[in-house]
Amino acid sequence: HAPGGGSYYAALWTNDQCEYANPFFPFSGYKAGIDQCINCYSAYENYMDRSDKPMREKRPLVSSVIAEGRSFWNGAGDRGDCEMYAYGLTRFLLEMSDIALIKRFWDDIIWCLDFALSRKNNYGVIESDSDELENRFESGNANLFTSCLTYDVLGNAATLAKVMGDAEHAKLWADERAKLRSSIEEYFGGNVEGFKTYKYYDGNRDLRAWICMPLTVEIFDR
């Protein structure tokens, strides 16, 4: 799932490792892979803007950690990277079911969801500069993928919050999840090429493969 395979990674990505590959490793029992996951999620912590700025003004999470962790790449702007990171991290933690690990990354989950929710537009969906296709195809100011990732993270994180005994965040995230589901339907739902489905972004008139994303997060309304 990355150049170098099981020997090394030439770079870490919020999509390739954080979102896609890492949630698999707890099922594998492959210790090197699980250790890699922890190291990978840890490497991104250096790039979470912990300044005193309002969350809306904070820097997005970088897309890639490169050069053995000494530098980064964010040439496509905010691709929904913190949402990708948190999607993979919360699933990884649920699968590991390790209280110490949940505590270890708890502040990162809070940061990511605070950031994501600060990017809600007036229609209640999550804005980002692009998606992992990095503007190879148009994605508008808010795309279906980023909002669906956020929806999934909110549910996963609410479950983890209950494990942590954090009733405040459990309720907040469950409530935000319900609101986001409604917003996804209202903003993205539509008729595309004769199908009652989803527009990938506002104004999208073509069927796109990623309009299946709601199905992957158990939204079966269309």
Predicted features by range, described:
Residues 1, 9, 13, 54-57, ...:
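Catalytic cores of carbohydrate-active enzymes
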Residues 10-123, 144-147, 151:
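Aromatic-rich carbohydrate-recognition surfaces in CAZymes
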Residues 18, 133-136:
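Intrinsically disordered, low-complexity regions of eukaryotic proteins
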